[in-house]
């Protein structure tokens, strides 16, 4: 297997296959869940709006892939600084049955010099999550500066985040390798690689992109770090590209073909 194919297979199993469109329907979410099951393995998770959690859970169970995790979003996409609302949304997501919650950090508050709101929001959302995984979206493309990106990452980690995530995918600039490096360096420098993961989201579209991101993680945190409890790709169109790279066609995907 070529290096690119090996990276594509690895990336596929680290994907949070995502649909977060305003016009999402039950049908779109059912289709997403079906796509999470491929001939070469399942994606790590699907990522959907909270109201679709019950239909996703049912679909994943009925197709025999209950191990695919369900991630959802809160305080999304604007990262407002109302802690009470963010916590209420997070509690509701957990009650719906989410396995993972991706909450948006109040990044504008941090830009304005307020570090406390972000810390409290993440801390209280983590308390609301209990054992449910909390990923915190810092919106790198809006923070822009290395000092702010690193500060946001540190605050999230200190407040109990299980993952730090680049972006909502709803702003002009989302994940970039440069931003990813800054965030991975914080995980390394704070010595929290065992307990904190990383998720680039938005802009990771090809097997080559995924290969470069994984190579960076291997370089900074070691070759065995980026497993599915420490690394995820937030993406939608990436899956098709990975399957094409792996030369998986509809025929190979048909179980009756075996």
From Swiss-Prot:
An annotated GO cellular component: cytoplasm
Catalysed conversion reaction: 2-deoxy-D-ribose 5-phosphate = D-glyceraldehyde 3-phosphate + acetaldehyde
Active site: 102, 165, 199
Pfam families: DeoC (PF01791)
Classification via Gene3D superfamilies: Aldolase class I (3.20.20.70)
Pathway given in the UniProt record: Carbohydrate degradation; 2-deoxy-D-ribose 1-phosphate degradation; D-glyceraldehyde 3-phosphate and acetaldehyde from 2-deoxy-alpha-D-ribose 1-phosphate: step 2/2
Subcellular location: Cytoplasm
Biological process annotations from GO: 2-deoxyribose 1-phosphate catabolic process; carbohydrate catabolic process; deoxyribonucleotide catabolic process
Source organism, top-level taxon: Bacteria
HAMAP family: DeoC_type2
Family per similarity comment: Belongs to the DeoC/FbaB aldolase family. DeoC type 2 subfamily.
Task of the protein: Catalyzes a reversible aldol reaction between acetaldehyde and D-glyceraldehyde 3-phosphate to generate 2-deoxy-D-ribose 5-phosphate.
Name by which UniProt lists this protein: Deoxyribose-phosphate aldolase
Source organism (scientific name): Aliivibrio fischeri (strain ATCC 700601 / ES114) (Vibrio fischeri)
Gene expressing this chain: deoC
